[in-house]
Swiss-Prot record:
Superkingdom, taxonomy of origin: Eukaryota
Comp. bias regions, Basic residues: 179-188
Feature: compositional bias, Gly residues: 101-131
Disordered: annotated span: 1-44, 58-134, 158-188, 320-344
Biased composition (Low complexity): 77-88
GO CC aspect terms: nucleus
Keyword hit for Amino-acid biosynthesis: no
Subcellular location: Nucleus
Descriptive protein name: Laforin, isoform 9
Keywords: Nucleus
Gene Ontology biological process terms in this record: negative regulation of TOR signaling; positive regulation of macroautophagy
Assembly information from the UniProt record: Interacts with isoform 1 and isoform 2.
Length: 344
């Protein structure tokens, strides 16, 4: 039988004080009386608490390496959903705090604050079942010791819905618990290379904290014609200059496209994000007249295929690429022409 790894796996006798049969018959030799003497006081709250691995006082050694009776720890650490260390150390677990294999103990405290829900297989004891009935937050086991328990990753998300909205709004400057909240630490301005300002009012930024460098906040410019006034934003179709968009595109700027003029941008349909221009040697001469006035193709239809694409289809369908025998008497062979034969 594997060593017991948490208080959940102990089987307690229904009568307190009556011993249970040992799990292996050879393991424990019970000598002396099997029942306590008459008049012995029954187990108090300390014994019941120790039996269920809930220490009454959380503190020092409870939260550090030694966890008495496999407890996750009381006090502040248990409130946020404590990391419980598994009590065995299989070799693949390394010296990892809260080992990866053995099921950890349950966190102390109410369920909505991360208590309960220990004892599962994959490095458990990391947080409890929240009010929605499943584990909401997985706490990473950083080597920071107690700071890993109390960071913002440990906070369990409250259940959405009615009880959040029916709660009266806290007074100004106070949190939901009533104590005054700490001033929020603003993100550094160095993360946002150009904080997006509302157009026309340079001092007033948007109602958002500056984003990180790689993912700026999405904003559609309304009245500015420059798509680079807000870098990284999606420009609106009517105000974007398509030549700037093509030249700034990471893929399309590689291809040699003729620059689209600003006048052609105004003729674009509103759904087209930019105008791709084909280089001059590939373009069909533009016919400005109506469809009936355009010159007809050889087949008599208005062929939508430009004439420079005609050789592509005929070339792919021809048999000239098929391998023929190199026979000089064969007129259809590759070297039938003597001048071509000399050239090769």
């Amino acid at each position: 039988m594997h060593p017991k790894e948490g208080a959940e796996q102990h089987v307690f006798s229904p009568v307190p004080g009556a011993p249970t049969p040992p799990p292996n018959r050879c393991g424990r030799l019970v000598l002396g009386p099997r029942l306590p003497a008459a008049g012995t006081p029954g187990p108090g709250i300390r014994a019941a608490a120790a039996r269920h691995a809930l220490p009454l006082w959380g503190g020092g050694a409870t939260r550090r390496g030694r966890r008495p009776a496999g407890a996750a720890g009381g006090g502040v650490a248990a409130r946020a959903g404590a990391l419980g260390a598994a009590r065995c150390r299989p070799p693949e677990a390394g010296r990892h705090r809260g080992g990866r294999r053995g099921p950890g103990p349950a966190g102390a405290g109410p369920v909505a604050r991360g208590g309960g829900a220990g004892g599962r297989g994959g490095g458990a004891g990391r947080g409890g079942a929240g009010p929605r009935g499943h584990v909401l937050v997985q706490v990473p086991e950083a080597g920071a010791g107690r700071r890993a328990l109390l960071g913002r990753y440990c906070q369990q998300t409250p259940a959405p819905g009615a009880e959040r909205e029916l709660r009266p709004a806290p007074p100004t400057g106070a949190s939901a618990s009533g104590r005054p909240r700490r001033p929020r630490r603003r993100a550094s301005r160095a993360f946002c290379p150009r904080p997006c300002a509302l157009p026309g009012r340079p001092g007033l930024t948007l109602l958002c904290r500056p984003r990180c460098r790689r993912q700026p906040r999405l904003r559609l410019p309304t009245d500015s014609l420059d798509p680079y006034s807000a870098p990284g934003r999606l420009p609106a179709h009517s105000v974007a200059c398509p030549s700037d968009l093509v030249s700034a595109h990471p893929v399309l700027s590689f291809f040699p496209t003729a620059p689209a003029s600003r006048a052609s941008a105004l003729r674009l349909p509103p759904g087209a994000p930019f105008a791709l221009r084909v280089p001059l040697d590939l373009r069909v001469p533009p016919f400005a007249g109506p469809l009936a006035a355009r010159p007809r193709a050889a087949d008599g239809f208005n062929s939508p295929t430009p004439p420079w694409l005609g050789f592509v289809s005929s070339f792919s369908c021809s048999n000239s690429l098929k391998k023929t025998q190199n026979d000089p008497t064969n007129e259809t062979s590759v070297f039938a022409n003597p001048r071509q034969q000399c050239a090769t």
